[in-house]
Amino acid sequence: LTIVGWLVFDMTNSPAWLGVVGASRAAPMIVLPFFGGVIADRMDRRLLLWITQSGQALLSLTLALLVALDLVLVWHIIVVMCLGAVVEAVDQPTRQAIVPSLVPRIDLRKAIALHAVVFSGGALVGPAIAGLLAPAVGLATVLFINVASFVPVFIALPLLHLPRFEPRQHEPILKSVRDGLRFAFTRELIIVVILVSAVSSLFGRSYQLLAPVFAREVLLTDITGLGWLASAPGLGAVLGAFAIASARWLPANGRLAGFSVAGYLLALVGFAISNNFGLSILLLVLVGLLNTVFSATVRT
């Protein structure tokens, strides 16, 4: 996303186009995860991960080739991002559904936090490496390196120990989705969690899309600086995950979720008005930390 955002802003010089690209990714993620969750309950999850990871690798390779051949247009990026979100709508609930099957219930919150470390570690290291390499080797090479990063995933999947999948009869998918929504909206706690998550995602994730604008126009830095900005939330996420996993005592889930989402939004306000690079980095570290605490809490 770091490279894609910089590429779009460099091609268009328009924050509006960054918004369009972001919308192309966000739109499928509004509706499709409901179906992704149902699919994850009905199919062999290891097979699903093979399919989704292969799809993401293929899309990454397509974008890398377009950039390398100097054929890339904004609409290409929009299509790739949209299709990537469709794949992620199945991949994400599948990965989340795997975690509870691997650990006892009592360790679930810690397991979710450690699960976040894996992906947050990528969010920490990936953008920084991309920002450092891009000026030296070019955007296309960085995108090809991203494609190569899927290789360890394909090596690890056969080693994943999961309960044996037992095929069985299921009701129609649409009915399952409808029943799931009906169940969710008859539980006050679930409604609150969904609304808080939706609001924080809608208004709190725009900094990721607009990071190239902040980097170049506000903080007066280049793609290397953008890489550090994009890595900062990853560092915070890793710290937050380790804090949850190692804590001997934590407040009740509801209270912890409320404090963390409030702090998350306040840190974002601070980032929005900051014109100091170092302060912006620190605020984004805090954003990543609090977002991980909130996510791990509500999933528990």
Residue ranges and their predicted role:
Residues 1-300:
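Alpha-helical transmembrane-bundle signature of multi-pass membrane transport and export proteins
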